[in-house]
Amino acid sequence: SKKTTSVDLAKRSLPKKREQFTINNMHVDKQDIIVEDVFNYFKYAVRKNMLFDLVVLDPPSFARSKKHTFSASKDYVKLLKEAIQITVKGGVIVASTNSANFSMMTFRDFIKRAFKELNEKYTVEESFSLPKDFRVHEKFKEGDYLKVVFIRKLR
């Protein structure tokens, strides 16, 4: 990509973000690095009619700001709905989570709900979870935490 917009609530992550751009031969000064609650940024982007070809969602399973507590199990549908609104038709949303509180089936239900509530259409391009050599013990289902879904917005 020529330009990215990174939104993170944690100011402490700025040096690491800059380092990652440098490692990937991307000019840091040409990237938008925003320290903000992502829900506030999404509202701003909608107001400014900003649209993105690719939106990557990788929130922590649980996070707290001054005004909001984010829980993946409770708030991921809302996060997806906000992302859908700023993704161009034909664009891709990469939805990921490390939350062990719900299954991949539930995660895909979150996606379905978000698109349905906005009367939008989508297709799942790919999905990933832990590799086969990373065994999850049947008595410790929480070990099956990784879920990544590539979603194409159709309209």
How does the language model describe each region?
Residues V46, V77-I84, K112:
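A structural alpha-helix within SAM-dependent methyltransferase catalytic domains
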Residues R12-V56:
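S-adenosyl-L-methionine
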Residues K3-D8:
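Conserved SAM-binding motif I beta-strand of class I
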Residues S13-L14, Y41-F42, S61-S65, N101-M104, ...:
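Flexible loop/turn segments at secondary-structure boundaries
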Residues K78, V92, T97-R155:
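C-terminal catalytic and target-recognition region of SAM-dependent MTase-like enzymes
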